[in-house]
From Swiss-Prot:
It comes from the Bacteria. Its EC number is 2.4.1.18. Monomer. GO terms for cellular component: cytosol. The active site is at residues 431, 484. GO terms for biological process: glycogen biosynthetic process. It comes from Trichodesmium erythraeum (strain IMS101). Catalyzes the formation of the alpha-1,6-glucosidic linkages in glycogen by scission of a 1,4-alpha-linked oligosaccharide from growing alpha-1,4-glucan chains and the subsequent attachment of the oligosaccharide to the alpha-1,6 position. Keywords: Carbohydrate metabolism, Glycogen biosynthesis, Glycogen metabolism, Glycosyltransferase, Transferase. It catalyses: Transfers a segment of a (1->4)-alpha-D-glucan chain to a primary hydroxy group in a similar glucan chain. This is 1,4-alpha-glucan branching enzyme GlgB.
């Protein structure tokens, strides 16, 4: 007997912070000789023996102080890579002893960086990682839980018994253990015991995959097994400036875009079938499409309509479908509702193959209170701020990250980098930035704490966002970082080195509210609210804006875009076309939610499909053609995107004709020479002989008309284009005599070839006439 009963009891009761001090192989001196003692704790074993790796000889182990604590003394100074033969009832199994592997994956440098909040690839150290130690393959586990009394690993490999794989705690609060002979596909959890003896079963905060809800275990995954085919895309992205590129985003919720029959499982490339994931108990016959199915169906659909990017509502793992993904428990795990991590990689790869960028909604502002998640992770407020006035959103029922804690900030910053590193995404949209940067966001007086200067700004959260954006653009130039910021926080898209938050785009919430308020009015009243249309131009160049009509505008009894519009059915469709035509010619990148292209009559239903049956009707088919052509116009005309963020990209022709609810303006490309003229009529009253001044003489081709018959409009227009008249108007020497369709937007472009040809023809005529006159 080489060990005390107290030491054995600490192991048996899960109270030892370093089980390696007791278990595994140890050298001892007996009778002047150096020998090896091997100890094992196997709670379900009847007998255990040691198998020598040298001669495969078995050495029976004896129970010591506890019927399930075994030890064996072997007459050899050192014994490595031994195995344990365990008899459990009628079954026997042979395993490598986890406590024979003492080497750690985390170095002191790793731990120092993590403690400082600066380990940018900590997701490759913490979590579960397939590795090889001393020639034996297995999985290395590491989790940060500094205030826990004990942490163990649970899984099928130990019958979910937390006594069998107790972890070792390091001086920084990171617990670790290498478990040999297991690999990809293993489900696991952490069993965390606090100092009061309460036990919590937790998913891995750094886990790469989780089980399909309602199950909550993490899954061991090898993320390096996928072979990417997007090298050309990634290289091109590095040298691209998003500010000068066309960006038209199709915002999509994968779980409600379209469903498939639950009786027709999806096929994997190897011929096997994907597990069927039902949409809900209320729809037992419907299943979610998989990432691979979406890669084929959604990508081709989006490409056909001409969008440049797909933005996914949060794809990180979340337990509640009704949260739309905004209450995340698995920050490093794409949701298993739609397939595996490799399946999601395939989706991104397929997008890039088709020239489509991928944006992911990222939620660093809060997390849910689900017991298996981050909340109260080690028995204390670890990830959330301990002060509820800072650490809880009561109206949302969620917890707020402690942005002043280095390890928490490191968790989130590394998480943002992770999606770009491992999944090759092209951008993130950061959700609810205002809730992060203000202490008093949605909090009444008395329920928030001022910062150290007495203000409402959450300084640590703002600094965290600056850190994240600085890292993103340092590691991944050419990507997008988009803020959903609904207040007037200054310099959101300004560089961090001048005090900005460092995003490269911000949703223009003011434009969205102004335009929806305007279009919901009866057209007769719009003449009194011209400011709704024009106000955004006063500030459009102060930030890099993205115009967004998102999912938030078509839920919670707000009605669909089509349902918001006044008038009869024809006017409703015409209003939708006018709204989006103005949006796509207004400065700013574009985002619109799925279903608006149909458009739907009903609100978005997270458990339903889009109203695809509407495409059986001509009016809805016309709208789909409208959006295809609108995207083509936007992406093919540099004047509509190159100077979105510069004052020089926009000029009013006339913004004061409120009596007719008409506005006209010029959009210019970076060279200043390429331009388009847009005229918007926001009433059902058409106007003939409506005069608009233009900067250059010549023939102006009508390159887009939202009232085209092909879109379901009245087909009123300008017969392909107009020649200018020498009529001074709107401070220009020449002008156009136009026909403005009802609730219509028309876009014109100077046809330089036709204009030059006409000038040359005129000059030739004048030359001939002059020669004839001279001859006479």
């Amino acid at each position: 007997m080489t060990i005390s009963a107290d030491q054995v009891n600490q192991i048996a009761w899960n109270h030892h912070h370093d089980p390696f001090q007791v278990l595994g192989s140890h050298q001892i001196e007996l009778s002047g000789k150096t020998m090896t003692v091997i100890r094992a704790y196997q709670p379900s074993a009847e007998a255990v023996s040691v198998i020598s790796p040298i001669d495969r000889k078995e050495y029976p182990m004896q129970s010591v102080h506890n019927p399930h604590f075994f030890e064996c003394v072997i007459n050899t100074p050192k014994l490595a890579n031994y195995q344990l033969k365990i008899k459990e009832g009628e079954h026997e199994r042979v395993i490598h002893d986890p406590y024979a592997f003492r080497s750690a994956k985390l170095t002191e440098f790793d731990l120092q960086l993590f403690g400082e909040g600066n380990h940018h690839r900590i997701y490759e150290k913490l979590g579960a990682h397939i590795t090889e130690v001393d020639g034996i393959k297995g999985v290395y586990f590491a989790v940060w839980a500094p205030n826990a009394r004990n942490v163990s690993i649970l899984g099928n490999f130990n019958y979910w018994d937390g006594r069998k794989h107790q972890m070792r705690k390091g001086h920084t609060g990171v617990w670790e253990l290498f478990i040999p002979d297991i690999g990809p596909g293993e489900s696991y959890k952490y069993e965390v015991k606090n100092w009061e003896g309460h036990i919590y079963e937790k998913s891995d905060p750094y886990g790469y995959q989780q089980e399909v809800r309602p199950k909550t275990a993490s899954i061991v995954v090898d993320l390096d097994s996928y072979t990417w085919n997007d090298q050309e895309w990634m290289e091109k992205r590095r040298h691209t400036d998003p500010l000068t590129q066309p960006i038209s985003v199709y915002e999509c919720h994968f779980g409600s875009w379209i469903h498939a029959s639950a009786h027709e499982p999806a096929k994997l490339p190897n011929g096997e079938t994907e597990p069927v994931v039902q949409v809900s108990e209320l729809r037992p016959d419907a299943r979610f499409l998989t990432y691979r199915e979406l890669a084929d169906r959604l990508v081709s659909y989006v490409k056909d309509l001409g969008y440049t990017h797909i933005e996914m509502l949060p794809v990180a793992e979340h337990p509640f479908d009704g949260s739309w993904g905004y209450q995340v428990t698995g920050f490093f795990a794409p949701t298993s509702r739609y397939g595996s991590a490799q399946d999601f990689m395939y989706f991104v790869d397929k997008c890039h193959e088709n020239g489509i960028g991928v944006i992911v909604d990222w939620v660093p502002g809060h997390f849910p209170k689900d017991g298996h998640g981050l909340a109260f992770f080690d028995g204390t407020h670890l990830y959330e701020h301990p002060d509820p006035r800072k650490g809880e959103h009561k109206q949302w029922g969620t917890l707020v990250f402690d942005y002043g804690r280095n390890e928490v900030r490191n968790f989130l910053a590394a998480n943002a980098l992770f999606w770009f590193d491992k999944y090759h995404i092209d951008g993130v949209r950061v959700d609810a930035v205002a809730s992060m940067v203000y202490h008093n966001y949605m909090r009444p007086d008395g329920e928030w704490v001022a910062n150290k200067y007495g203000g409402v700004e959450y300084i640590e959260a703002a600094d965290f966002l600056r850190q994240v954006n600085h890292l993103l653009f340092s590691y991944y130039p050419g990507v997008l970082s988009i803020a959903e910021e609904s207040t007037s926080w200054p310099m959101v898209t300004w560089p961090t080195y001048v005090g900005g938050l460092g995003f490269n785009f911000k949703w223009n919430m003011g434009w969205m509210h102004d335009m929806l308020d305007y279009f919901e009015m009866d057209p007769w009243f719009r003449q009194f609210h011209q400011n709704n249309v024009t106000f955004s131009i006063w500030y459009h160049h102060t930030e890099n804006y993205m115009l967004a009509l998102s999912h938030d505008e078509v839920v919670h009894c707000k009605s669909s875009i089509l349902g918001k519009m006044p008038g009869d059915n024809w006017q409703k469709f015409a209003n939708v076309r006018a709204l989006f035509a103005y949006m796509f010619t207004h400065p700013g990148k574009k985002t619109m939610f799925m279903g608006m292209e149909l458009p739907q009559w009903g609100e978005w239903d997270v458990w339903g499909d889009l109203e695809w049956h509407l495409l059986e009707f001509d009016a809805h088919q016309g709208m789909k053609r409208f959006f295809r052509d609108l995207n083509h116009l936007y992406c093919s005309e540099p004047a509509l995107y190159e100077q979105d963020c510069n004052e020089g990209g926009f000029e009013w022709i006339d913004c004061n004709d409120n009596n007719h609810s008409v506005v006209s303006f010029i959009r210019r490309a970076k060279d200043g020479k390429d331009f388009v003229v847009t005229v918007c009529n926001f009433t059902p009253q058409p106007h003939s002989h409506y005069r608009v001044g233009v900067p250059e003489p010549g023939f102006y081709t009508e390159i887009f008309n939202s009232d085209a018959g092909n879109y379901g409009g009245s087909n009123m227009g300008n017969l392909g284009g107009k020649w200018t008249d020498d009529w001074f108007f709107h401070d220009y020497q020449q002008s156009l005599d136009l026909c403005l369709p009802p609730l219509g937007v028309v876009v014109f472009q100077l046809d330089k070839k036709k204009t030059i040809a006409m000038i040359q023809e005129s000059e030739d005529v004048e030359t001939v006439e002059a020669k004839a006159k001279n001859a006479s």
